[in-house]
């Protein structure tokens, strides 16, 4: 059994999309902390934040992180999971942390194209491009500090998955046919 693989990065970097594809390529299970949390409390992230504030949401997010962390699991985390020092240390110690890095323009384009965009609470109350830029400026150093690997997430999901697999130790990779994928 391999330690969990944690995908971190801002909204729109592809954590869920890449996570599902990476799980399929490695034969790992897939978990998403936001989806796990929403299914267990039967509320959207926006509703949790509205009822409990960001502090309440962050506490629930830590519980979700611990609940989904298991060997041979790819975990897509919420964009702000790295704001809690415990979460950063936990992921770095327990698993392999992969920062999916993308520029503001890519993130904004992806977020604008997302059908679930209205379910995500605004973090600053500002226009999307301004919010993404500010949030990334605040969090980039934390993503980098937490990550074992930093991967360019501007490419296609298949290319990103291939780059992640190439960066990981061979014991993480699943042999498909005669080649590692």
From Swiss-Prot:
Q: In which pathway does it act?
A: Metabolic intermediate biosynthesis; chorismate biosynthesis; chorismate from D-erythrose 4-phosphate and phosphoenolpyruvate: step 5/7
EC number(s) stated in the UniProt entry for this protein: 2.7.1.71
This protein's GO CC annotations: cytosol
Where does it localize?
Answer: Cytoplasm
Predominant location:
cytoplasm
Q: Where does Mg(2+) bind?
A: 16, 32
Q: What GO MF annotations does this protein's record show?
A: ATP binding; magnesium ion binding; shikimate kinase activity
InterPro entries xref list: P-loop_NTPase, Shikimate/glucono_kinase, Shikimate_kinase/TSH1, Shikimate_kinase_2, Shikimate_kinase_CS
Superkingdom assignment: Bacteria
Q: Any idea which positions bind ATP? A: 12-17, 120
| HAMAP family xref list | Shikimate_kinase, Shikimate_kinase_2
Tell me the protein family, please. Answer: Belongs to the shikimate kinase family. AroL subfamily.
**Protein name in the entry:** Shikimate kinase 2
Q: Which species is the source of this protein? A: Salmonella schwarzengrund (strain CVM19633)
């Amino acid at each position: 059994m391999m330690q969990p693989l944690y995908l971190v990065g801002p909204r729109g970097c592809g954590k869920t999309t890449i996570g599902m594809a990476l799980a399929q390529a490695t034969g790992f299970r897939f978990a998403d902390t936001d989806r796990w949390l929403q299914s267990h409390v039967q509320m959207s992230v926006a509703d949790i934040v509205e009822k409990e504030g960001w502090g309440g949401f962050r506490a629930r997010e830590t519980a979700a992180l611990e609940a989904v962390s298991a060997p041979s699991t790819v975990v897509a985390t919420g964009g702000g999971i790295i704001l809690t020092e415990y979460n950063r240390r936990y992921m770095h110690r327990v698993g392999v942390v992969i920062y999916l890095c993308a520029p503001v323009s890519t993130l904004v384009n992806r977020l604008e194209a997302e059908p679930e965009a209205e379910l995500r609470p605004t973090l600053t109350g500002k226009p999307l491009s301004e919010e993404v830029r500010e949030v990334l400026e605040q969090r980039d150093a934390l993503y980098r500090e937490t990550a074992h690997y930093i991967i360019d997430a501007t490419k296609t999901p298949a290319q990103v998955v291939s780059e992640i697999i190439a960066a990981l130790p061979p014991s993480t990779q699943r042999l498909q046919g005669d080649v590692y994928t």
